[in-house]
């Protein structure tokens, strides 16, 4: 089995050039003086990934207030990314305000250790990297294909890193910068039904009484 090479905390984040939904980008040159949250998703038009992108977009201003640029990535083509972004806008009324890298040759994914063969040799896992305004890798988190990320925790992580830098301190378990007003709702208790694998299944799925935003993204209570 191929050995996965991972970047290391405290070292410069791997440099790259890539095509995105916002045009070509060059890292770190295009992001000097900014923090970056670079995150990969397994594939466009998949349900868990869609919920993550909706959540990142809804919290975009929170990241912006912290001088953080979001960058998404998968091995899909730019055409697929654009179609998916348009689908998200149509079905959820949400604009995706950050670039998504089209890493079809897996060049960036391999630099950041996003391909884990035991999970998939053709999809990236849910990897996330926090890179500071000096281009240094400060934190990384890997999630399996089945589990969506908690965007509030990503924001808390950024807050903790920036507070540690600014104040010369460390943050304890469960630390938050101030009392939070975030509340969980019934929506947070729903799970995603695996997407259909045939056209017939897709048609049936829409008739089975699940809560479906589109044919590929349906939820239910358990």
Swiss-Prot record:
Entry annotated with the keyword Cytoplasm: yes
Disulfide bonding pattern of the chain: 212-218
Active-site residues, as the UniProt record annotates them: 49
Pfam families: 1-cysPrx_C, AhpC-TSA
CDD domains membership: PRX_1cys
Highest taxon of the lineage: Bacteria
InterPro entries referenced in this protein's UniProt entry, alphabetically: AhpC/TSA, Peroxiredoxin, Peroxiredoxin_AhpC-typ, Peroxiredoxin_C, Peroxiredoxin_TDXH, PRX_1cys, Thioredoxin-like_sf, Thioredoxin_domain
EC number: 1.11.1.24
Subunit and interaction comment: Homodecamer. Pentamer of dimers that assemble into a ring structure.
Protein name (database record): Peroxiredoxin
Source organism of the structure: Aquifex aeolicus (strain VF5)
């Amino acid at each position: 089995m191929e050995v996965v090479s991972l970047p290391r905390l405290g070292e410069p984040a791997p440099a790259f050039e890539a095509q995105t939904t916002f045009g070509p980008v060059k890292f770190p040159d295009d992001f000097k003086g900014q923090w970056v949250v670079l995150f990969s998703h397994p594939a466009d038009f998949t349900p868990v990934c869609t919920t993550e992108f909706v959540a990142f977009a809804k919290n975009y201003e929170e990241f912006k207030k912290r001088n953080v640029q979001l960058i998404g990535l998968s091995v899909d083509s730019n055409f697929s990314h654009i179609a998916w972004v348009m689908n998200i806008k149509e079905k959820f009324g949400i604009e995706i305000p950050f670039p998504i890298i089209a890493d079809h040759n897996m060049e960036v994914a391999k630099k950041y250790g996003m391909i884990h063969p035991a999970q998939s040799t053709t999809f990236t896992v849910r990897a996330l990297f926090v890179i500071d305004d000096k281009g240094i890798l400060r934190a990384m988190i890997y999630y399996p294909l089945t589990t969506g990320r908690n965007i509030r925790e990503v924001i808390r992580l950024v807050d903790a890193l920036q507070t540690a830098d600014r104040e010369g301190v460390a943050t304890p378990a469960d630390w938050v910068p101030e009392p939070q007003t975030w509340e969980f709702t019934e929506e947070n208790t729903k799970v995603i039904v695996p997407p259909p694998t045939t056209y017939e299944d897709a048609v049936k799925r829409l008739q089975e009484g699940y809560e479906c935003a589109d044919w590929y993204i349906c939820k239910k209570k358990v």
